[in-house]
């Protein structure tokens, strides 16, 4: 059954699927092609007639994941240039005032799309939510800092998508005044950035941060260095005008080289002392440009930004095992390597003993995975919560602790494992969660997200600095936990991240 809705740019034709109206590939901006590859998003050109919105659009250009991780996180690739589009699942286009949830996908700002099978919005629509997902520009195209182009184009795309929601979602039954924006990993970092920038103020009422916070921003001087190296390797000037003529495949090749070098052992002769010293973890990420961002998002939030936005935040128990376990590196990590990492991170060598004492690792590889889980994910998220103690809006915390049986159980409750539980798409993620994950846990997690988007209350007490209580999701029992892993949390007090 076909359904036609009039948007601000023209009519779109969706389809009725199991009682839910679904619209795919609706443009929220013009395709970023040719001379417009690096420009700010432009409003979609109005069209005559009815535009088909029954199939997903192209996905943003991105390289493949490393093989070991790509076997777990399956990506959908759809070729084409018209990829600044969004998708809508609605229980009833004729309804009035339904809560809206807008999903921002993760992928280190270089991978992912809004059309991945695990992000199917049908379960949210079945529970009375108008669900929206979208694509945004990634990698060099979205985040390389160039003097003749706006910075943070990927973020500008996200804002443009949210503005489309504000202007059009009532036509799909949604309430533009009750929007929850949520994301995972780089998507959660994006949400935190949107909370921090005045440009997005008023576009959403609630936010959910899944495994990402507000400390991943690139300093302007580092962004300039990265752009210069990219251009040098491509044999062009470090400008948008020059890079607009470089084939996308070449951009992606250099993008992969740059990411591997910066995340490995960057040569100071190439990258300078700052980047070689670890100033950049994600080379393509929000840039502190003085316009969209004047400081790191975490600092802006500590100063009061986004304090009127209800917040649900959390992490998985074993985040970093996704990046260590599949590669086979865990058994080869030595105690000396752990000690060196602790020293570089500003912690004493004895910190490793605290991780073992709290049951967070016996072997060096397991200890390192827990240390980096805290360093990159858990502690930055907790600092966001701590900075909102006096906020008028409420803050809620969670920990996702269910351990996947995949790879003989060595992944644990790794990064991204909660996604099919949030979306109730367990059958789309067997590579990550196996063939018999607990559906009851998916129902529990998903329902909490729906409750939060509907009312601002996921169903458990708000986070506070006295108890630091969070909901620990696990099977067969999910329960409130007071101050998880307090000793290792305290190790990071005062340590810059």
Swiss-Prot record:
Subcellular location: Secreted
Source taxon at top rank: Bacteria
Keyword Secreted applies: yes
UniProt keyword terms in alphabetical order: Hydrolase, Secreted, Serine esterase
One GO cellular component term: extracellular region
GO molecular function terms attached to this record: carboxylesterase activity
UniProt catalytic activity: a carboxylic ester + H2O = an alcohol + a carboxylate + H(+)
Keyword Hydrolase attached: yes
Catalytic residues of the enzyme: 185, 319, 415
Broadest EC class assigned to this enzyme: hydrolase
E.C. numbers: 3.1.1.1
pH dependence, record text: Optimum pH is 6 with cyclic PET trimers as substrate (at 60 degrees Celsius).
Thermal activity characteristics from the UniProt entry: Optimum temperature is 60 degrees Celsius with cyclic PET trimers as substrate.
Family label: Belongs to the type-B carboxylesterase/lipase family.
Record protein name field: Carboxylesterase
Biological source species: Thermobifida fusca
């Amino acid at each position: 059954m076909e359904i036609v809705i009039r948007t601000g740019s023209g009519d779109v034709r969706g389809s009725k699927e199991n009682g839910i109206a679904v619209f795919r590939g609706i443009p929220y901006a013009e395709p970023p092609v040719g001379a417009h590859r690096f420009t700010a998003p432009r409003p979609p050109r109005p069209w005559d007639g009815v535009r088909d919105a029954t199939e997903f659009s192209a996905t943003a250009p991105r390289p493949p994941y490393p093989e070991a991780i790509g076997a777990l996180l399956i990506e959908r690739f759809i070729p084409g240039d018209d990829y600044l589009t969004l998708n809508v699942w609605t229980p009833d286009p004729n309804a009035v005032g339904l809560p809206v949830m807008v999903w921002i996908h993760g992928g280190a700002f270089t991978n992912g799309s809004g059309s991945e099978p695990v992000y199917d919005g049908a379960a949210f629509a079945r529970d009375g939510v108008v669900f929206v997902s979208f694509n945004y520009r990634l990698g060099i195209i979205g985040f390389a800092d160039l003097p003749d182009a706006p910075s943070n184009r990927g973020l500008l795309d996200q804002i443009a998508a949210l503005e489309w929601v504000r202007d059009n979602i009532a036509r799909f039954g949604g309430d533009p005044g009750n929007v929850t924006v949520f994301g995972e990993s780089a998507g959660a970092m994006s949400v935190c950035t949107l909370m921090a920038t005045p440009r997005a103020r008023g576009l959403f009422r609630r936010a959910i941060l899944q495994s990402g916070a507000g400390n991943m921003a690139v300093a302007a001087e580092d962004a300039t260095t990265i752009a210069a190296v990219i251009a040098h390797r491509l044999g062009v000037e470090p400008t948008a005008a020059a890079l607009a003529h470089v084939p996308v495949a070449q951009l992606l090749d250099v993008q992969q080289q740059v990411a591997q070098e910066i995340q490995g052992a960057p040569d100071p002769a190439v990258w300078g002392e700052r980047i070689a010293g670890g100033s950049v973890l994600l080379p393509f990420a929000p840039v502190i440009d003085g316009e969209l961002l004047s400081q790191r998002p975490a600092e802006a939030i500590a100063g009061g930004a986004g304090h009127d936005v209800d917040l649900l935040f959390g992490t998985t128990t074993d985040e970093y095992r996704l990046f260590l376990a599949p590669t086979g590196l865990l058994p080869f990590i030595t105690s000396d390597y752990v000690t060196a990492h602790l020293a570089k991170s500003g912690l004493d060598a004895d910190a490793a003993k605290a991780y073992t004492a709290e049951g967070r690792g016996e072997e060096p590889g397991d200890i390192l995975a827990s240390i980096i889980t805290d360093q990159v994910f858990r502690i930055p998220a907790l600092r966001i919560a701590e900075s909102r103690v006096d906020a008028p809006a409420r803050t809620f915390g969670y920990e996702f602790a269910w351990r996947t049986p995949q790879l003989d159980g060595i992944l644990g409750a790794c990064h991204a494992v909660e996604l099919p539980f949030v979306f109730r798409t367990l059958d789309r993620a067997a590579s990550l969660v196996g063939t018999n994950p607990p559906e009851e846990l998916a129902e529990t997690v998903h329902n909490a997200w729906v409750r939060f988007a509907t009312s601002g209350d996921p169903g458990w007490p708000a986070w506070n600095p006295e108890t630091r209580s969070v909901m620990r999701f696990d099977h067969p029992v999910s329960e409130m936990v007071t101050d998880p892993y307090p000793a290792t949390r305290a190790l990071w007090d005062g340590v810059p991240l």
